[in-house]
């Protein structure tokens, strides 16, 4: 048994909090979001207005933004540290916005549509998001059904629900739902923790180069409407772009990989390696140092999981063409303790064996993470 920063890692790898029964930090300021404020003090009609108002609160303490029941149709950016964004429950409070990457470049500092499409962007340290559904409501399925040569087809159909942006760290999402199709959760910052939540999507719907731990959650694959050949990979759960210098990437622990109606058996890969296209002194091409890491530990897998479990991903070659192919065999992919109809898998020659244990993962993810910002784990 190991102790650190108020936490205990027991032999099984479970996390337990030492001497603390609280479920969140004490707040020094509170703001309310409601569709019926009726002139109440510190009550706002939109989530963004409430977050903007928090800028006037003194620095240092935690701030609670309590969001009432309802559908809030807005793009939200959270930049203040030590904010607790709390809804009335995943079936009562909904933060939603409808935009794909193709139309969202104007919302991003580098004019990149994928992060620009995010319904909720978090770019702060020590943030708790709980008790609400966050969704990008772009109609992916209607677009997916269009032929590639249809002029109405949106090519860049990524539509992010939650972006953990570059300056984010120690972000906890719990008792929440993240809904989308392609690119639902973009982990592009430092450390994130998702617990007792649902993440739903189909193409690369948990992705990025950040350190992300998903615990005791449901990873729900959603259907495609495009035409596929028999036994063709239709969807991918994770697309990590973890830098080689980073020990931890995307880790799914003690969670359930389920599917919605219409997702065929053997059609969904656990992960594929994303090598983002970046600028280098000798050109612009797929980053060779982004050797993605994805770990699945003690997870239930339904029959929709691909028999090979992992698949390849194309990237930008040095000549600018999309001919570079990155394979699972050259990535940092690993699983242990899998169970369920989709747990059995073929041997495709995965050679990477230096996978961290769940105890190491939790030490890295929770290092210097004040226990007040996490609550009771587990």
Where do the PLM segments sit?
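Bacterial N-terminal signal peptides
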Residues: 6-17
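Sequence-level preference for short, compositionally simple segments enriched
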Residues: 25-378
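Positively charged n-region of N-terminal signal peptides that target proteins for export
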Residues: 1-4
């Amino acid at each position: 048994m190991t102790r650190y920063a108020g936490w205990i890692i027991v032999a099984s790898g479970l996390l337990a909090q030492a001497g603390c029964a609280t479920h969140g930090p004490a707040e020094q300021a509170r703001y309310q979001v409601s569709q019926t404020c009726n002139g109440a003090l510190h009550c706002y009609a939109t989530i963004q207005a409430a977050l903007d108002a928090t800028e006037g609160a003194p620095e240092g303490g935690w701030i609670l933004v309590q969001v009432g029941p309802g559908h809030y149709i807005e793009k939200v950016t959270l930049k203040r540290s030590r904010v607790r964004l709390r809804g009335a429950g995943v079936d009562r409070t909904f933060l939603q916005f409808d935009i794909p990457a193709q139309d969202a470049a104007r919302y991003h500092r580098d004019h990149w549509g994928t992060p620009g499409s995010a319904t909720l962007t978090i770019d702060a340290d020590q943030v708790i998001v709980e008790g609400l559904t966050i969704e990008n409501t772009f109609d992916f399925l209607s677009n997916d059904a269009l032929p590639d040569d249809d002029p109405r087809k949106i090519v860049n159909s990524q539509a992010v629900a939650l972006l953990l942006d570059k300056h984010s760290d120690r972000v906890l999402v719990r008792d929440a739902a993240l809904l989308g199709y392609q690119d639902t959760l973009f982990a592009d910052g430092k450390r994130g923790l998702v617990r007792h939540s649902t993440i739903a999507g189909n193409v690369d719907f948990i992705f990025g180069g950040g350190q992300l731990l998903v615990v005791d959650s449901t990873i729900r694959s959603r259907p495609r409407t495009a035409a596929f050949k028999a036994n063709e990979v239709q969807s991918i759960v994770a697309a990590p772009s973890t830098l080689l210098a980073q020990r931890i990437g995307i880790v799914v622990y003690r969670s359930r990989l389920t599917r919605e109606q219409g997702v065929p058996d053997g059609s969904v890969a656990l992960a594929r390696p994303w090598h983002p296209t970046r600028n280098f002194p000798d050109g612009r091409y797929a980053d060779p140092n982004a050797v993605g890491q994805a770990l699945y530990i003690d997870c239930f897998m339904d029959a929709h999981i691909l028999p090979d479990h992992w698949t390849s991903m194309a990237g930008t070659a040095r000549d600018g063409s999309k001919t570079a192919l990155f394979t699972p065999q050259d990535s940092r992919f690993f699983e242990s303790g899998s169970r369920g109809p989709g747990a059995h898998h073929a041997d495709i020659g995965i050679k990477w064996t230096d996978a961290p244990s769940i105890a190491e993962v939790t030490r890295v993810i929770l290092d210097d993470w004040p226990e007040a910002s996490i609550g009771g784990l587990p």
